Regions:
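Conserved loop-alpha-helix segment in the C-terminal half of the alpha/beta-hydrolase fold
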Residues: 228-266
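Conserved HGGG/HGGXW glycine-rich cap/lid loop of the alpha/beta-hydrolase fold
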Residues: 26-79
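Conserved alpha/beta-hydrolase catalytic His-Asp/Glu region
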Residues: 162-218
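An N-terminal hydrophobic leader/cap segment in hydrolases
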Residues: 1-20, 31
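Active-site loop/oxyanion-hole signature of alpha/beta-hydrolase fold enzymes
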Residues: 14, 23-34, 70-111, 280
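Gly/Ala-rich beta-loop-alpha elbow adjacent to hydrolase catalytic centers
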Residues: 112, 116, 120
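Catalytic histidine-centered segment of alpha/beta-hydrolase-like enzymes
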Residues: 263-275, 279
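Flexible "cap/lid" loop of the alpha/beta hydrolase fold
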Residues: 121-125, 132-165
């Protein structure tokens, strides 16, 4: 794995506050970094599909002390409860509830990676009075005529592993990609496994993909057209899921231009490929969005 850099240890050892808030009869876990300070701007970080708040453990501290920062486990993922059915409205309500519980101000900017960007977009429309802007991280509204890379089918009974180490070794990024920073993938894997029944499994509802609504392409397109809050976009220059064609399609859906930045040498999981460059690019983007 090679030498793990000091900045990583400093980040993941940064203390954070933890809490749980109930939304529609389900517990939603959240964590927050930095002091509660009414004079300090706030960020709400939203993970991607099948992920969790700990994906941000080595990113959020890099934005201190300038922000109060919170992240959550969307229901159906991480350590939050599972639902029988999932929908964009309820996930958006979870973001608002966490922002309130974590003491984030009305100047909060949502930062959403991948599927988290989709939920962040809907939240920024549904709860425009509670938030101040949105930054999408390799997320957006794909050109419907552009083909998607193949992904493995999901659903059915959870795969059980005999021990935690075996489960961690089976962890894979989705969509599949290489990552030179193996220590980051290993850290995420260690926080992605739970004990269930007579074995270990990954922390997500395997029925999630077949029991959610409000997240179709037409829903995302409608939300992007309706978005009134300032928007910014970061994407991996080498991403399989975000292309210049999709960027052009998104610009065509908006009446006003919005700032974008292609992160060099980064794929879909851009803050795993280039964590330090991502933090700097995000800082710059947040300044642009806050000034819009």
């Amino acid at each position: 794995m090679g030498t793990i850099p000091d900045w990583f240890w400093a980040a993941v050892e940064t203390p954070y506050e933890e809490g749980v808030v109930e939304v529609d009869e389900c517990d939603v876990r959240w964590q927050a970094w930095g002091e509660r300070d009414a004079d300090k701007p706030s960020l709400l970080l939203v993970h991607g599909m099948f992920a969790h708040a700990h994906w941000w453990d080595f990113i959020a501290p890099g934005l201190l002390p300038d922000y109060r920062i919170a992240a959550l486990d969307l229901t159906g993922m991480g350590d939050s409860d599972y639902r029988y059915e999932y929908d964009a409205d309820t996930w958006a309500d979870e973001l608002r509830a966490v922002a309130d519980a974590a003491g984030l101000g009305d100047d909060t900017i949502i930062v959403g990676h991948s599927f988290g960007g989709r939920i962040g977009l809907h939240t920024a429309v549904r709860h425009a009075d509670r938030f101040a802007g949105l930054v999408l991280a390799d997320a957006g509204v794909r050109d419907p005529d552009e083909s998607l890379p193949e992904r493995p089918p999901m659903g059915g009974r959870p795969v059980l592993y005999p021990d935690e180490e075996t489960a961690r070794r089976r962890f894979r990024l989705q969509p599949a990609q290489s990552c030179a920073n193996e220590f980051l993938v290993e850290y995420i894997a260690r926080n992605s496994v739970m004990r269930i029944d007579d074995g270990f499994a990954f922390k997500f509802d395997t029925d999630l993909m077949t029991s959610m609504s409000g997240v179709a392409h037409e829903d995302a397109e409608r939300d992007l057209r309706a978005l009134a809050l300032p928007l910014g976009l970061l994407y991996g220059a080498d991403s399989e899921l975000f292309s210049e064609r999709t960027l052009g399609y998104m610009r065509g859906l908006r009446d006003a231009p919005f700032p974008t930045h292609a992160l060099a040498d980064a794929q879909h999981h851009l803050f795993l490929d280039q964590p330090l460059a991502f933090v700097e690019a995000l800082r710059t983007m947040l300044t642009a969005v806050r000034g819009a």
